[in-house]
């Protein structure tokens, strides 16, 4: 928005002032807008000449209110805006003057150069003064307007050759290289952030890695020097082999690969190993018969697979055959080879050597060496892999038995598929038996079965053979029919229902129902001491005792588990009695989520009695010492929502409910008096009784359901106490303490008091 400005050296000053301050509404709108621009710091050297705030401040009309008094708050804001406008105008004058002076200097230099180059410089100079006087300046662009009519008709854009391109030199925008010595590895920085002094888990060594030379890796840029050296050696070997092969090809191109390998002498020892491998490969290539590869069969079942591809109806038999072979994929000899050594020395049908492999490594409680612990770690990893493979095997069998929802759908078999299947079976029997004589007859029979069609019977209705009792049957009254089975015949409600379509897997079965995050221990994970286990077996005395005792193992019935739980409870009671008072205060609780400490081990049903009592006692003591750490308290966070109740309104509504009950009581009493005029009333009419429950019931009608949720009996009782103090009410309880009785005097006295 532009306005006219006031200038002191203007002849039409009165006219400008008249036009500037005539419209009061426009003047106030401009003033408010300019004050807002000044407070928002939106005034700069470009738009400072568009604001006439200095003229308005000079007039002082906009600063006066209705009582012709100056508003000093507006005056201070206006003065601040005038200072900003004035300073911006000074900056604008400075920049524009600099541009003008630089333009004049450039024009002077250009004119001098043009004068020197031209032959008639004086004539042109004289004519130039006259031309400069006739030059017109465009007020919009500030550029001179040419007098040539052709130029005026076709306006041409003048390009500034100095600022023709906006690209900056690459060196100015190029990022400087950072100092590599001051750069911190982000992985190491993250490790330092995660490190605190909270415990052993947050130690710095636990967050860092260690290479194969037992060196702590603090930086991700550190690489394995051994691997780097091996990579360099491999590259050198490849280069030497390529160079050697090129030389051999140039000298003796007609010789075979074997002869070149034998004749060439290798001086470097590094090339010996790859050259031997190449010779072995070349020998193998000579013995391979490439002409028989296309004819050879990989497996005996490939022919059956091709038949299945040609005829899809044979797929079911082929899959069943493969599944049967998979079920019996290992023979007894293969099982003996697959099971570790000492497979024949087992106890209760379980391999003790395998049991040792399945034992997970525990802390080094005994004085065993590090090599022995490494062996235990290897055995533990193989045991865990074996357990996963065993789980996967059972999952595969369970998936085969589980069909899902599709299992209960009725399948629609086409007759053509059945006929084709019968013909295929006949052809298979013919090929197996080798009866070539019956070939034509079987083909004719199969073709006859395909061509034969059952003749459709014509439906005929005989109207003469009608039954006399037909009408009685049709128009007989229908009795009440039930499709449900009688209650007396029902044995079990779920007996005639389909089983739940639930897919069981070994992972689900081995997890506890109450605590799904915890798995049952499928195998015994107790680590036996060196005295108990020798090369994967218990002591010979224990094994011989178990073999000599050929008793049938006890069945894991309810008595078995009851005895185990009772024994466990007895052990816990003995532990509690043996503990001192100081240990109870300062000690920590056992971890309830530990596999070995969480009740009875499920493997006790499949294991024999442990003869080594000392080892079991030692293990129990170790468990007591190792598993002492506090349980994390599972705190439930409840949402706290503040109730919004208008207590003043509630108090008025309680008093209104009391008055409504009083009016109902009085109207009921008047009706009784009018109906029974002859009877005398001996009860005290000055005091009346109300129940607190009736008062609350009357309040519930005055609120909506959402508001009524926040109102409780406590709020109502507090309001009732205030009303009792104000109006002299008496509150007493009932005999059963299930309600409150409010005694009040006559309403007239209470209203008069209020």
Swiss-Prot record:
InterPro entries: Condensin_barren_su2. Residues 118-128 have a biased composition (Gly residues). Signal peptide: none annotated. Pfam families: Cnd2 (PF05786). GO terms for biological process: cell division; chromosome condensation; mitotic chromosome condensation; mitotic sister chromatid segregation; tRNA gene clustering. The keyword Phosphoprotein applies. Residues 362-371 have a biased composition (Basic and acidic residues). The keyword Transcription regulation does not apply. Transmembrane segments: none annotated. Component of the condensin complex, which contains the SMC2 and SMC4 heterodimer, and three non SMC subunits that probably regulate the complex: BRN1, YCS4 and YCG1/YCS5. Regulatory subunit of the condensin complex, a complex required for conversion of interphase chromatin into mitotic-like condense chromosomes. The condensin complex probably introduces positive supercoils into relaxed DNA in the presence of type I topoisomerases and converts nicked DNA into positive knotted forms in the presence of type II topoisomerases. The condensin complex probably also plays a role during interphase. This is Condensin complex subunit 2. It comes from Saccharomyces cerevisiae (strain ATCC 204508 / S288c) (Baker's yeast). The lineage of its organism: Eukaryota, Fungi, Dikarya, Ascomycota, Saccharomycotina.
